[in-house]
Amino acid sequence: YARDCQTRYPNKRLLIHFIQPHYPFIGPTASRIQEHTGKNIGGSVPMESKKDDFDLEKHSRFNSYTDAIEAGISRQKIRTAYAESIAEVIKSTKSLIDDLPGKTVITADHGEHLGDKPIPFGGRLWGHPPGVRSDALCVVPWVEFESDSRKQLTAEPPQEQPSVDNEVVEQRLRSLGYK
């Protein structure tokens, strides 16, 4: 999709969001976990189940981190599956860096707790639970790759968009665990 966007919008900055390392995890360890449990590794079910459009049947194909631990999957295996998912994305980004003109920046929308204890005397945290602020969640990489070519950007006046009801925005933020 990134290359298609570059073709369609050659004079625009592109923001390309990879779903990994969000679930489903990809890579050999994730495949072995799926063989062992019948499900892939996933995120935190309680936050997601608050969404109005939550699809329990679809979500049941994924283990929450807690489910994976209870099924005998070690913290280290979960961390390995997570790292392999990131490695798979990095492979894809390497070719994009070469193919897309101009500077490329790699960053993340958030970090992930992988069974660590960010709060003294607290329990282990998994995923990105709502209401938790920690370095593991908030400190993300920012890596810049310069290019010999500079992308020529074209500014255009903003297009009129229909306004969104503030209550709809608030509801969506609550559904995503931000409120």
What do these predicted regions represent?
Residues 1-179:
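Catalytic domains that recognize anionic headgroups
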